[in-house]
From Swiss-Prot:
Mapped Kelch repeat ranges: 51-95, 97-149, 151-186, 187-232, 235-284, 306-355, 357-386
Subcellular location as annotated: Periplasm
Single GO MF annotation: racemase and epimerase activity, acting on carbohydrates and derivatives
Active site per UniProt: 241
Catalysed conversion reaction: N-acetyl-alpha-neuraminate = N-acetyl-beta-neuraminate
Entry annotated with the keyword Zinc: no
Function: Converts alpha-N-acetylneuranimic acid (Neu5Ac) to the beta-anomer, accelerating the equilibrium between the alpha- and beta-anomers. Probably facilitates sialidase-negative bacteria to compete successfully for limited amounts of extracellular Neu5Ac, which is likely taken up in the beta-anomer. In addition, the rapid removal of sialic acid from solution might be advantageous to the bacterium to damp down host responses.
Name of the protein in its database record: N-acetylneuraminate epimerase
Keyword list, A-Z: Carbohydrate metabolism, Isomerase, Kelch repeat, Periplasm, Repeat, Signal
Gene expressing this chain: nanM
NCBIfam families found in the cross-reference section: muta_rot_YjhT, PRK14131.1
Enzyme Commission numbers on file: 5.1.3.24
Organism: Salmonella typhimurium (strain LT2 / SGSC1412 / ATCC 700720)
Length: 386
């Protein structure tokens, strides 16, 4: 999840491959204009007609769309979101409507941050939003979701609503008492991962029936801020946080068949060049291009994993957060280091169209939102970054 809120700031040797990385300005990849306003911790999805929708996060209640099939591609503003400004929502298209699940925000300027469990949907035909008459079985912040078919979405992971909300209530209560606030922060972070009770239940929401189903549990610990991808009926749940500040390098893999999820053998990202171990990523970009699953960017706290192994529960205390620019590819069943992005970036929106993976917005190494749109494309054995 990355813990981007203001009070959370206290929170391989390079292989010679037949694949290479290149920065290209050729016609191999689609060039998209910048988003009208910088976007981090937002959400987005693409419909069946090649139209991308992004919004929320640092864009507040604003949403934008861009039609990839048009010769002249420009972002257009759509009707603002009625549910209030929020971050870390998940969105997918179901039955030709854009569904938005959960997030974290404030009910008003005086209230503390809190986890949402509501669902909204947007009609592109009518340009209208509607609150869906449902609530999720658990609060949804730091969760991830993938579309299973035209009526169902799989949602899993995320923070524990009660523990998360209590932290911000306590922070607000401490107010200007810096000593008390530091005590709240330390007590919150100085716990083992199991004490945060991150969600490990897998839920399936059916938009046609407006129902939720328990589809089992993750094969390991619950995570927050994971990246997820669905391809050829295989779900990949990539890294994420085990607790605030501590990532995992594990990638869960499952097969979706006959409305059943079957978990397969886990894999792990390799260490970055020059580093002894892979800390794991939160807020990474991901998507498929010509059959290769690409994962790039995100952020972590180098050294937090070793601290935690040594018994230091506040594992990222005193460690500067590092935004990443490495790109990894899953090639013939093995993860490989592929190269670097144009800049370190995380917590943006990943959208796949054809064999291009668009990286929309994100947070740079200064913690600032960006409005740029870049892309990954595998072409003739090369990873093209545009």
């Amino acid at each position: 999840m990355g813990m981007q809120m203001k009070n959370f700031k206290k929170m391989m040797t390079l292989m010679a491959l037949c694949f290479s990385v290149a920065i290209t300005t050729s016609g191999y990849a689609t060039t998209l204009p910048d988003i009208p306003e910088p976007l981090k911790n937002g959400t987005g999805a693409i419909d069946n007609n090649g139209v991308i929708y992004v919004g929320l996060g640092t864009a507040g209640t604003s949403w934008y769309k861009i039609d990839l099939k048009k010769q002249h591609k420009d972002w257009e503003r759509i009707k603002s979101f009625p549910g209030g400004a929020r971050e870390q929502s998940v969105s997918v298209f179901l039955n030709d409507e854009l569904y938005v699940f959960g997030g974290v925000g404030k009910k008003n300027s005086e209230s503390p941050l809190q986890v949402y469990s509501d669902v909204y949907k947007y009609s592109p035909v009518k340009n209208t939003w509607q609150k869906v008459d449902t609530i999720s079985p658990v609060g949804l912040t730091g969760h991830t979701g993938v579309k299973l078919n035209e009526t169902m979405v799989l949602i899993t992971g995320g923070v524990n609503e009660h523990i998360f909300d209590k932290y911000f209530i306590d922070i607000a209560a401490a107010a200007a008492d810096e000593s008390e606030k530091n005590k709240v922060i330390y007590n919150y972070f100085n716990k083992p991962a199991k004490d945060y009770f991150f969600n490990k239940i897998v839920f399936i929401y059916n938009a046609k029936e407006n129902t939720w189903k328990n589809a089992g549990e993750l094969p390991g610990a619950g995570t927050a801020g994971s990246s997820s991808v669905m391809g050829n009926n295989f779900l990949m749940l990539i890294n994420g946080e085990l607790k605030p500040g501590l990532r995992t390098d594990v990638i869960y893999r499952a097969m979706w068949d006959n409305d059943k999820l079957t978990w397969l053998k886990n894999s792990q990202l390799p260490p970055s060049p020059g580093e002894q171990q892979q800390e794991g990523l939160a807020g990474a970009f991901s998507g498929y291009s010509h059959g290769v699953l690409l994962v790039g960017g995100g952020a972590n706290f180098p050294g937090a994993k070793q601290n935690y192994t040594n018994g230091k529960f506040y594992s990222h205390e005193g460690i500067n957060k590092k935004w990443r620019d490495e790109v990894y590819g899953l090639i013939n069943g093995h993860w490989q280091y592929m190269g670097k992005m144009k800049q370190p970036l995380g917590y943006g929106v990943s959208v796949s169209y054809g064999d291009e993976v668009f990286l929309i917005g994100g947070e740079n190494a200064k913690g600032k939102p960006v409005s740029s749109v870049t892309s990954f494309t595998m072409r003739d054995g090369n990873l093209l970054i545009k």
